[in-house]
């Protein structure tokens, strides 16, 4: 679970930037 969270956050940041 905690391993997937960084991936999701990273995807959102990439999409936001």
From Swiss-Prot:
GO cellular component: extracellular region
Keywords linked to the UniProt accession: Amidation, Secreted
Tissues of expression: Expressed by the venom gland.
Main location: secreted
Superkingdom, natural source: Eukaryota
Lysine amide found at: 17
Location(s) in or outside the cell: Secreted
Similarity annotation: Belongs to the non-disulfide-bridged peptide (NDBP) superfamily. Short antimicrobial peptide (group 4) family.
Its job: Antimicrobial peptide with low to moderate activity against most of clinically relevant Gram-positive and Gram-negative microbial pathogens (P.aeruginosa (DSM 50071); MIC>400 ug/mL, E.coli (DSM 787); MIC=100 ug/mL, K.pneumoniae (ATCC BAA 1705); MIC>100 ug/mL, A.baumannii (DSM 30008); MIC=50 ug/mL, S.aureus (ATCC 43300); MIC=25 ug/mL, S.epidermidis (DSM 28319); MIC=25 ug/mL, E.faecalis (MF 06036); MIC=50 ug/mL, E.faecium (NCTC 12201); MIC=25 ug/mL, C.difficile (DSM 27147); MIC=25 ug/mL, C.difficile (ATCC BAA 1382); MIC=25 ug/mL).
Name of protein: Peptide TtAP-2
Organism expressing this protein natively: Tityus trinitatis (Trinidad thick-tailed scorpion)
Organism lineage: Eukaryota, Metazoa, Ecdysozoa, Arthropoda, Chelicerata
